[in-house]
Amino acid sequence: MDSLSRLLALYPMRTALDVRCHFGAPFVLQQDAAGAGIAPYHLILQGQARLTVAGQPELALQAGDIVLFPHGGAHTLHLSDATLASAPVYEVASASALRTVVNDGDGAVTDILCGQFTWEPQVSQALLAALPPCLLVRTQGAVHLAGLQSLMKLLQQ
């Protein structure tokens, strides 16, 4: 067992996919701060988005990007002016067990999977404190992340 595996064994975590967002631009997806021990994440499966986090420069996200918030910080994903209202969002029936939401935006399509990692709050403090407020992994064109790219393609179906 390597060092990282031993470290992660000390901090058991769970993960869950919460919702699939299939939006046409313009859209604004705001997420409030999560509770202790909850780290939300988003996988950009198709299209693009902008990420706004208070006190941080805005980031451009594209298909293949994974963004994680180890401290559960509030953030906004959007493809428009983040201060404007987006096209109304509503839930649709889906063949999958995953909740799916869409909007009536008629612009470029962005497909996002949203989920969260959860740890016991008192156990996770030491590990998560060492991480920045936002982690971005760009898988597009990264040969060493081929397994992660394959997983994202599988989840897209």
Model-derived features with residue positions:
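Amphipathic alpha-helical segments enriched in hydrophobic/aromatic residues interleaved with Lys/Arg
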Residues: 101-157
